[in-house]
Amino acid sequence: MELGLERIFSAHQALLQSAYESTIVHVAGSNGKGTLCATLAVHLNHLGKSTVMFTSPHLVRVEERIRINGRPIDVQAFDQCLLQIRSIELELGLKLTFFEITFLVACLTAHREQASFFIVETGLGGRYDATRILPADAAVITSLSLEHRDILGDTLAEISAEKAAIARPGKPLIVRQIHDETAISAIEFEATNAGISALGEAFGPADLNWIEIPDGATFQQEALLLAKGVFAWFNLNTDDLQASVRSLRWPG
């Protein structure tokens, strides 16, 4: 696996010549990422906000990775994006990965749709994940555990640092409270020293917000509490959040 953001950053810059109209929410974590993304999207739709959501993997069709207001992108629109991306690959002499290509389809879709919110799930880690190139307005971290140790590190602190590197200067970093002191310190360090200069970001602190979640909470219970933290930041009403979630059908 290749680590680094230069290739995807170059392709993204070439494809999208203007800024996003969307508020971008970036979600990382070991488990529960997709559930949180779906919870955010369904309530935003309930509030009358348009959404584009990018998650992975898909269960049946690749188009499931990109959802417009909860529905997978249609095949024709997906294929049209592929043609644009292939043109950029040839122009810049790049060979993008499957994940990078599907992510760029989501970016093109959010940009074209001028969605109110673009909700994006990381693929692996955070610091070097392709999705890190986005100018996110909020970052969220779900539960953390030892995973992908060959890539992210051998300890919970190392893994936590890689995921917390999605923090953006001056923006909220909303994190499920953990009780490992070394992991807490790693997250606090990344939040204090947020920003990647190669992406044009200035260095500075993120606004770290810990969300207490009971032990044994299900992914949906976790998602509800984290979603409330996100919506509070954007001053969005959560009175009907439970009702929104009851209409959600999220496989996996």
Protein language model features and the residues they cover:
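ATP-dependent carboxylate-amine ligase catalytic core
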Residues: L5, F9-E21, H46-L134, D150-G153, ...
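Aromatic/hydrophobic pocket-lining residues that form π-stacking "cages" and hydrophobic walls in ligand
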Residues: L40, A106, S185-E188
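Acidic, Mg2+-coordinating active-site environments of NTP-dependent enzymes
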Residues: Q114-E121, A136-P251
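A short linear hydrophobic-aromatic micro-motif
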Residues: V52, P251-G252
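A conserved segment at the C-terminal end of the G1
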Residues: T23-V27, T35-V52
